[in-house]
């Protein structure tokens, strides 16, 4: 399990209309490898509104169609639900994710 990997999660929340949702791990790698039972993830949606906090992803990342990572909707998920591996972000996409996370969290360099 690594930062930047995408996983399909069945029934991610009781209020979600879909049976499953793809999430990308955004926690730092040392936390992913730690004894903590959860990691921070960003959901992937088929809607892309072109916001600076959204990262376009698609077939290259293992998805069936064009989608986007929504960095404004971070969630904590148990590592135990991240079992259905979908794909991995390229270094270029990981850099775009980092930029979008900085914008979403108002982190200035």
Report residues per predicted region:
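Conserved functional hotspots at enzyme active or ligand-binding sites that engage polyanionic ligands
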Residues: 1-109
